Swiss-Prot record:
Phosphorylated on Asp-52 by ArsS. Gene3D superfamilies: 3.40.50.2300, 6.10.250.690, Winged helix-like DNA-binding domain superfamily/Winged helix DNA-binding domain. The gene is arsR. Keywords: DNA-binding, Phosphoprotein, Transcription, Transcription regulation, Two-component regulatory system. Changing residue 52 to N: Significant decrease in levels of UreA, UreI and UreE expression in a pH independent manner. Significant increase in biofilm formation. InterPro entries: CheY-like_superfamily, OmpR/PhoB-type_DNA-bd, Sig_transdc_resp-reg_C-effctor, Sig_transdc_resp-reg_receiver, WalR-like, WH-like_DNA-bd_sf. One of its GO terms (molecular function) is phosphorelay response regulator activity. The keyword Flavoprotein does not apply. The keyword Cell membrane does not apply. This is Transcriptional regulatory protein ArsR. Member of the two-component regulatory system ArsS/ArsR that regulates genes involved in biofilm formation and acid adaptation by acting on major ammonia-producing pathways. Upon phosphorylation by ArsS, functions as a transcription regulator by direct binding to promoter regions of target genes including ureA, amiE and amiF to positively regulate their expression in response to acidic pH. Negatively autoregulates its expression. The modification 4-aspartylphosphate is found at residue 52. One of its GO terms (biological process) is regulation of DNA-templated transcription. It holds the Pfam family Trans_reg_C.
Length: 225
């Protein structure tokens, strides 16, 4: 599922857009306070940012500038401010598109899909040759590393395939437990850590200095390669 970060202080609008986009396979996480939105952008991995400009405590143009300096993420400005100078500054600060309010949510959906298509094409051109280190066979519930089958328990398969499904995305321990069928959702964080440790022993050259399964302090884990 596509993950969109929204920074919008109009809660009613945010809820309306979130419900509409979810019907089209796009999950939206909204923050109505810009500093928490910036923190989320820097600690989580999203496919796209939908950003309002008129925000409390910090102007959206500055939010755009800060996030685009720290993260490579497509940005759509969604704002009632239609001044040409705002549009120019937003694009200069890293925005990819500018959609003046009010607008039809179907137009927003079309712009999101178009921007993500362009973004993915760029990734395909620049993706290094090691992009296919891992391969998941969902029918046989097996994971291959460099085309060699890994000997995994059911829980190990579920966690590793989850991490592979969204490379670079930070999964909390709680979400890992919820998404893994064989793990009790109420399992302790320690239980998840133990399984991660076993996985590292099977895929890492040096489990104590992992290069694939990376710990994100205070949150959980992500897969990088």
């Amino acid at each position: 599922m596509i993950e969109v970060l929204m920074i919008e202080d109009d809660i009613e609008l945010a809820e309306f857009l979130s419900e509409f986009l979810l019907q089209h396979g796009i999950h939206v996480t909204n923050y109505d306070e810009p500093y928490t939105g910036i923190s989320a952008a820097n600690t989580q991995n999203y496919d796209l940012l939908l950003l309002d400009l008129t925000l409390p405590n910090l102007d959206g143009l500055e939010v755009c500038r800060r996030i685009s300096k720290q993260k490579h993420i497509p940005i759509i400005i969604s704002s009632a401010r239609s001044d040409v100078e705002d549009k120019i500054k937003a694009l200069d600060y890293g925005a990819d598109d500018y959609l003046p309010k009010p607008y039809d949510p179907k137009e927003l959906l079309a712009r999101i899909q178009s921007l993500l298509r362009r973004s993915h094409k760029k990734e395909e051109v620049s993706e290094p040759g090691d992009a296919n280190i891992f391969r998941v066979d969902k029918d046989s519930r097996e994971v291959y590393m460099h085309e060699k089958k890994l000997d995994l328990t059911r829980a190990e398969y579920e966690i590793l395939s989850l991490l592979i499904s969204k490379k670079g995305y930070v999964f909390s321990r709680e979400s890992i437990a919820i998404e893994s069928e064989s793990i009790n959702p109420e399992s302790s964080n320690k239980s998840i850590d133990v399984i991660i440790g076993r996985l590292r022993s099977k895929i890492e050259k040096n489990p104590k200095q992992p290069q694939y399964i990376i710990s994100v302090r205070g949150i959980g884990y992500k897969l990088e390669y």
